[in-house]
Amino acid sequence: MDFETGEHQYQYKDILSVFEDAFVDNFDCKDVQDMPKSILSKEEIDHIIMSKDAVSGTLRLFWTLLSKQEEMVQKFVEEVLRINYKFLMSPIKTEQRQPSMMTRMYIEQRDRLYNDNQVFAKYNVSRLQPYLKLRQALLELRPAKNVLIDGVLGSGKTWVALDVCLSYKVQCKMDFKIFWLNLKNCNSPETVLEMLQKLLYQIDPNWTSRSDHSSNIKLRIHSIQAELRRLLKSKPYENCLLVLLNVQNAKAWNAFNLSCKILLTTRFKQVTDFLSAATTTHISLDHHSMTLTPDEVKSLLLKYLDCRPQDLPREVLTTNPRRLSIIAESIRDGLATWDNWKHVNCDKLTTIIESSLNVLEPAEYRKMFDRLSVFPPSAHIPTILLSLIWFDVIKSDVMVVVNKLHKYSLVEKQPKESTISIPSIYLELKVKLENEYALHRSIVDHYNIPKTFDSDDLIPPYLDQYFYSHIGHHLKNIEHPERMTLFRMVFLDFRFLEQKIRHDSTAWNASGSILNTLQQLKFYKPYICDNDPKYERLVNAILDFLPKIEENLICSKYTDLLRIALMAEDEAIFEEAHKQVQRFDDRVWFTNHGRFHQHRQIINLGDNEGRHAVYLHNDFCLIALASGQILLTDVSLEGEDTYLLRDESDSSDILRMAVFNQQKHLITLHCNGSVKLWSLWPDCPGRRHSGGSKQQLVNSVVKRFIGSYANLKIVAFYLNEDAGLPEANIQLHVAFINGDVSILNWDEQDQEFKLSHVPVLKTMQSGIRCFVQVLKRYYVVCTSNCTLTVWDLTNGSSNTLELHVFNVENDTPLALDVFDERSKTATVLLIFKYSVWRLNFLPGLSVSLQSEAVQLPEGSFITCGKRSTDGRYLLLGTSEGLIVYDLKISDPVLRSNVSEHIECVDIYELFDPVYKYIVLCGAKGKQVVHVHTLRSVSGSNSHQNREIAWVHSADEISVMTKACLEPNVYLRSLMDMTRERTQLLAVDSKERIHLIKPAISRISEWSTITPTHAASNCKINAISAFNDEQIFVGYVDGVIIDVIHDTALPQQFIEEPIDYLKQVSPNILVASAHSAQKTVIFQLEKIDPLQPNDQWPLMMDVSTKYASLQEGQYIILFSDHGVCHLDIANPSAFVKPKDSEEYIVGFDLKNSLLFLAYENNIIDVFRLIFSCNQLRYEQICEEEIAQKAKISYLVATDDGTMLAMGFENGTLELFAVENRKVQLIYSIEEVHEHCIRQLLFSPCKLLLISCAEQLCFWNVTHMRNNQLEREQKRRRSRRHKQHSVTQEDAVDAAPIAADIDVDVTFVADEFHPVNRGTAELWRNKRGNAIRPELLACVKFVGNEARQFFTDAHFSHFYAIDDEGVYYHLQLLELSRLQPPPDPVTLDIANQYEDLKNLRILDSPLMQDSDSEGADVVGNLVLEKNGGVARATPILEEASS
């Protein structure tokens, strides 16, 4: 008070909030970047400018200023605002000197609230989201309406209410009349009366009771309530607000429901549930968006602790404000430290929690609540388990107790899951249970683990999410012998491991994660192994195995981990898997004799694709997502620290990013022309940080100093971390769209970029794509039209390089990279879409240019590139995979991911003698980033001077021979098999032909043939292998080579790429070029000596997709527009019907029946009639199917009674051909996700195989026995049914019963002598309960395989996917090898049986020293014997 004038003196802090609306409308919060650092710190400025709107920014500015001394606020008003905001400064100064009546009323109310709540006044931290939501609700509140704040104990309900009621806008809305009552102890009529009287005294201090104190207390309550209602409806109080804190129950609420505006807080669900949404706005502080943010956690801790922000721990496992404040108090008072606070029992917190539990009456309820501590923290506890731990005290239904606990907010219910959870603050209560072992025992017994895991289904029945997440917590608390047995039974079971992985999610909520499974295996390893070395080896093998197969598992819903493990090359994994499959002798199992595993570890991105990736120190990875967010996550498989960085006001695509300043900061260039600076490691506590992130917009820095750049976009930047200048060691060079280049210096103290004093370089070059600084003196600039310019920064002169060898017309520059800088020399890598160049700076200011021989595959192009920090290797992402290019020897030394269109790469040097680099790789259309490792290769193991090899290759331990592919070569998915099935022919990326003998799986039995024509560098486009002596290949230049004789077949008709090549008989070869609509038919040997030979080869203008020889006389050609044929005896009589208007998209020819599918989904069936030396087609039926997707493949059974069609969307449908109709039997959706490339029936009609992104084996008998009703169009998936397949609506693969009304044509044709062996193998096989029709599913490593081959018995299957991985799957017949296994008992710790006769790979201990470790795309097979005996050849089939 001014004693001379008698007036109060007010500070700027008192009246600043009065001008909130004026600041929201007129003040640009980004201008705080120009404020003196003496007013706001760098961190405070970042916190303000990151706000997503003006309201949030203004509130954060005001809250920050109000936390400072008055002199700082005065400086802000009188110095900062004076520059650009004088129109704001003047009224603030006027109001400070002579405040209005409303301002004085506001200050009076605010001071009173602060005075009544001293702890709040000292330690409150404003919480933006709850503040905004509650303030808006109060501003919209009208009389007789309510606002409710609920939350668990300690969630900060009262302080949020106080903070919002201090708002000038709220005070005005309530006419500065807010009345407060704390109803914490209002549990009786006496306390109700007391609190009503207290409220009446607040409103009318002169009020005196006229009631007789001896009268009935209810009458007195009603009397005061009536008086309060009368007062609150009067004009002075019609807008007032009544705040009811800590409402305990509905009775207390009813007593104070006085028909005015009411704000109430409660932690009791009974109050929350009682108040209707029609009258009450509900705000829950338990919602994830309302909890404390990491910045708010930090601010709260700093209120209590006298320390620097960086001294706070990064990880504080709570956001409960009350718990946080008590932790901080304990540390401040020396009762705990940051290292041991989790283990210190705080008496103050215990007292608070205990007092909150006093509501539990009778005593049995407290006992039941205490027993909940038997469950692990944060678990979602199934309510069915509660009766097990309350069995001796519960006197009513479990849900009665749950509802009571929930009523007092002591548990939280998740009705959809039928589970409850315990609020985290109650976990601080240390409870000692007398019978803890018995409680754990009862939970373990509930799941009946021995019986459950002895089930005959591939998904163990009756297990819930709780079991997969927390069963180990209970197992470790039971007695030793059984504990060890059950741990092994559960955690070594591949079915359990698979379901656990599928149920888990990543820290950023991507579905499917191995992290928690790995962590639990490591944590429970002592219980599993129990000092047994054999189990130590097995657990270690599983820990190594799971990361390698994670991609296959999460990318296919129907791939079984047990099936993958049975095909693993690790000895311990295979033996354990083989032991487990003995239980399922009626299932389909394979051993693998090819190259199945590629061992690619991944980072699962969920629904996002990765656009850019950077590997950081300490096994962190930075990934720019397609959503515009940036993921920073621990990829060590040890931790799960994750930060999601985003700019909520701009989600534009990131074009480039780079880390600097010891990886503490990030620079990003966006498609909208902005460049942003990010702080990578939030020093605020808490992991999984996902809020808006601090950024500095570099464009704004330049804009504030050079107004002409206001609307210019930045198109490129260069970061120099070794500038060596006195004022800065880090410089950022930015190029604008108009060709100007500016330089910014890094301010280490303020942690931001500031414009340097170096004049702007005006290049006048538009379309700058990338540039680098060389020798600290020159710029090398490349524009979008590939113009190279060198600028001398000392004088601003330029020199356009006239390089005659620099032929990059119609190319696109991707990146420039400078390295090997010395005093006068340096090298710049120029990476373009189709080429890579090396620009060498030489002494005397001269340059030389050389092209790098990156050897791109035909038709592919470079998408991105990254050089290793040591300058040795250049990692190139291309449209066909990764290339590791050795800059020392100028040679591509390794290939990988050849099936992928690479979008981002990074290479990180490890400084390890063995493991040299980590490689990151993201691909188009993939929601994963691959993590590869490169190891060193030296001495006798090196291959053609190659010094590195992939660690992810399965063949690191394989025997290498001359037949092995080089590390930078891979198998193409172009293959054929001889009719006798004696040899498989495959083509590699060097156009060599590999002869693989399936009967002998050793690599040493592989051989290669390189036709002479390969010297022309032409690509093989088609291959045909009739027998071991008749092998032909067709090239893109139209040349057809006889591989065995290395001669070209004479023809000049086709010069275009040979797309189809098929030898239909020992003497007839058909070749076709689709693009040219040409077909050539060769007669390999003259059949009739009397027939003239001058008419061969036959040439015709038709595009042949498939050719077939019928009756030994007629060649039938299938084309896009029809079917034509010719008679070999009379080749000139070529019958070509009129072209169809619709394309033929599928066809087959079986049992003299011709099946054609058109693009309009019309199906035609014809019978072939051979008579009088003529071939005629008799139409049997024409049907339009209901499926609207495009047909991709059609196949019929050998007898023509059924056909299957695959569609481009992955759908598969089975049809019957009967009574001159094509009728739908079964439709399968959701299994294949890609276009189906091939289908094949087994001769006995028990099996159908489909090939796309995975190889699926289908039970035809099950589909036939559960076929659609005639009027039905679809059969819905039974994915969500968990019951046994023997139940009423599913008949499995048992033989069709005689009394079923089924046409005889659908009975499996298993009694034919040729088919009997196949029927024996596949009869009575079944799938699981989710997909009973699906017998097995093998996910390819690559994106797809286009074809596969099989032997006659359908026991061996061969494929090469587009990743170059060779598969040889052999059916494992358990019933033929040994009798059915005994039921699983508790004693499962038996020794492994000797399975050497079934091993997949040779032992690693016996490998040759020639193990080079080429990438799996360049690796071959290993020996593996046993299983089903080899079968006789299968007959040729014609289908498409």
From Swiss-Prot:
Residues 133-301 form the NB-ARC domain. GO terms for cellular component: apoptosome. The keyword Lipid biosynthesis does not apply. Residues 14-92 form the CARD domain. Residues 966-1373 are annotated as: beta-propellor 2 (7 WD repeats). Keywords: Apoptosis, Repeat, WD repeat. Induction: Induced by ionizing radiation including X-ray and UV. The keyword Hydrolase does not apply. Residues 1269-1289 are annotated as: Disordered. Disruption phenotype: Pupal lethal. Reduced apoptosis during neuronal development results in central nervous system hyperplasia; a larger number of differentiated neurons survive in late stage embryos and third instar larvae have larger brains. Delayed removal of the larval salivary gland due to defects in induction of apoptosis. Imaginal discs of the eye and wing are enlarged. RNAi-mediated knockdown significantly reduces levels of apoptosis and caspase activity during embryonic development. WD repeats lie at residues 649-688, 736-801, 857-895, 1186-1225, 1231-1268. Pfam families: APAF1_C, Dark_CARD, Dark_WHD, NB-ARC. Residues 597-965 are annotated as: beta-propellor 1 (8 WD repeats). Gene3D superfamilies: 1.25.40.370, P-loop containing nucleotide triphosphate hydrolases, Winged helix-like DNA-binding domain superfamily/Winged helix DNA-binding domain, YVTN repeat-like/Quinoprotein amine dehydrogenase. GO terms for molecular function: ADP binding; ATP binding; CARD domain binding; identical protein binding; structural molecule activity. Changing residue 333 to A: Prevents oligomerization through disruption of the oligomeric interface. GO terms for biological process: apoptotic process; autophagic cell death; central nervous system formation; chaeta development; compound eye retinal cell programmed cell death; dendrite morphogenesis; melanization defense response; negative regulation of humoral immune response. Residues 1273-1283 have a biased composition (Basic residues). May be AMPylated on Lys-251. Possesses an N-terminal caspase activation and recruitment domain (CARD). At high protein concentrations in vitro the CARD domain mediates the interaction of two octomeric apoptosome rings to form a double ring structure. Main component of the apoptosome, an adapter protein complex that mediates activation of the caspase cascade in programmed cell death initiated by the intrinsic apoptosis pathway. Recruits the initiator caspase Dronc, promoting its autocatalytic cleavage and activation; triggers the caspase cascade upstream of the effector caspases Drice and dcp-1. Effector of reaper, grim and hid induced cell killing. Produces at least two isoforms that may activate distinct caspases by separate pathways. Exists as an auto-inhibited monomer; this state is maintained by intramolecular interactions between the NB-ARC and WD repeat domains. In vitro, at high protein concentrations or in the presence of non-physiologically high dATP concentrations, assembles into homooctomeric rings 300A in diameter to form the apoptosome complex; two rings can interact face to face (via CARD domains with some involvement of the WD repeat beta-propellors) to form a double ring structure. The octomeric ring may represent a non-functional or off-pathway conformation. This is Apoptosome protein Dark. It comes from Drosophila melanogaster (Fruit fly).
